[in-house]
Amino acid sequence: MEIDYLDKALDDIEFWKKTGDKVIQKRISKLLESISKTPYSGIGKPEPLKHQLSGYWSRRITEEHRIVYTVSSDRIKIISLRFHYT
């Protein structure tokens, strides 16, 4: 499935590149690959979000940070890659 990124998500990717944290960069890469193949299962403990974020999904990058995304029939939209559900 094709992946699109919101501007905030692109800013978050730049943030992670600037940190130089190769472990997190590699983790994000693996998570994005998994999301593109199996959006609702796989690594990172995928979970549907609730309340105001109903329809969104998240996966754990670290204890503190999550990837938040939505899935349509042919696309995945990455919303953010930092913090919890912001």
Question: Across the structure, where does each feature detected by a protein language model lie?
Answer:
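Generic amphipathic, hydrophobic interface segment in small proteins and small subunits
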Residues: 30-55
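Enriched for short, Lys/Arg-rich terminal
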Residues: 2-4, 8-26, 30, 49-50, ...
